[in-house]
UniProtKB/Swiss-Prot annotation:
Descriptive protein name: T-cell receptor alpha chain V region CTL-F3
Renumbered residue ranges of the record's region V segment: 23-114
UniProt KW Transmembrane helix keyword: no
Taxonomic source organism: Mus musculus
SS bonds (residue pairs): C44-C111
Lineage: Eukaryota, Metazoa, Chordata, Craniata, Vertebrata
SMART domains: IG
Length: 132
């Protein structure tokens, strides 16, 4: 196959942009184990070229992942099932917190970001195990 040099350059550029769009999500803890009643904090930091939308998903054993939170503006603090998450654009963080862990909170938690409807970029996930 014989391509013109400008066509090759465009293809290489497109492949580079597709491979590295500048978005990443980091969940520093892969496994968190704590006693029922203690506070929970699951860390999520991100890097993004644009101003992203952030999400937390929860996946209980033998169930599909479910959306737990979405955040579109700075310093909003929605609450769901006792959990809350605050988006801090200044520190590029969207940590998930709960004042008192329950046994039913044991699950896999994923932080994710999206830029204006583009694909979701997920963190590695954090498995929370709550013991009596």
């Amino acid at each position: 196959m014989n391509m013109r040099p400008d066509t090759c350059s465009v293809l290489v550029l497109l492949l580079m942009l597709r491979r590295n769009n500048g978005d990443s999500v980091t969940q520093t803890e892969g496994l968190v184990t704590l006693t029922e009643g203690l506070p929970v904090m699951l860390n999520c930091t991100y890097q993004s070229t644009y101003s992203p939308f952030l999400f937390w998903y929860v996946q209980h054993l033998n169930e599909a992942p479910k959306l737990l939170f979405k955040s579109f503006t700075d310093n909003k603090r929605p609450e769901h099932q006792g959990f809350h998450a605050t988006l801090h654009k200044s520190s590029s963080s969207f940590h998930l917190q709960k004042s008192s862990a329950q046994l039913s909170d044991s699950a896999l938690y994923y932080c994710a970001l999206s830029n204006a409807g583009a694909k979701l970029t997920f963190g590695g996930g954090t498995r929370l195990t709550v013991r009596p």
